[in-house]
Amino acid sequence: FLHSSRTKPSKVKKADVPEHLKDKYTDEINDLTAEVLKNLEFLGVDYLIPIGGDDTLSYGVRLYQEGVKVVAIPKTMDNDVPGTDYCIGFSTCVTRTIELTNNLRTVAGSHERFLVLEVFGRYAGFTALLPTMAGAANRCVIPEYEFDISTLAELLSEDRLKNPSRYSIALISEGAMFKGGEMVFKDRTTDAYGHAKLGGIGDLVSEE
């Protein structure tokens, strides 16, 4: 088993280059794939089995193109790896989301409120859609379709009136967008894979 890391070997910042390689790689962004290939050969790795999401697996494709024998296993709660029906971790995400919303129903009902929950998922809406289909919420909003806040408010109001406990629940995917709007980012700084941190659309929906 090799150690896990959030570093993308093909795009390593100068400050993150290992000490013994700093003299060799001096650019602001460095591709250390040659070192990865060298280490795999040194370790006698015949097959590499990367387990992860689209970032991990996309680099697995790079190594495959370099001649490494790769067998990829999709593992991401987002369930957003193309070419596969199921990702390890997604069922746990759905289960936990359902448990969380069920735990909050008493609070929502006792105060007769609208409950808005923002869930992970980045650009895919599975983490909001599947729990809603399983009864965790009345409505969900996903990144694949821009939504009109007025329509959502009307639907939630109707759901609330039909509920004897006078509450309704909406699951909002973190990548969801208002009609004509853009994705909401909590932090514009990016991680090693170039992703900015999504977050905040749930708060905006609550305010509306």
List each language-model region with its residue ranges.
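Short acidic/His/Gly/Ser-rich catalytic and metal-binding motifs that mark active-site loops
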Residues: 10-14, 80-81, 178-183
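Glycine-rich nucleotide/cofactor/substrate-binding loop typically near the N-terminus or early
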Residues: 1-41
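Short gly/pro/ser/thr-enriched loop/turn and capping motifs at secondary-structure boundaries
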Residues: 9, 57, 76-81, 147-149
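Short alpha-helices
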Residues: 65, 76-79, 86-91
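Short beta-alpha connecting loops at secondary-structure transitions
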Residues: 79-81, 85, 188-193
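Short glycine-rich anion-binding loops that position phosphate/pyrophosphate groups of nucleotides
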Residues: 7-8, 53-55, 76, 175-177
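Accessory alpha-helical/coil subdomains and C-terminal extensions
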Residues: 29-32, 38-41, 47-52, 60-62, ...
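Short, conserved acidic/polar surface loops in the N-terminal third of protein domains
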Residues: 12-16, 59-63, 82-84
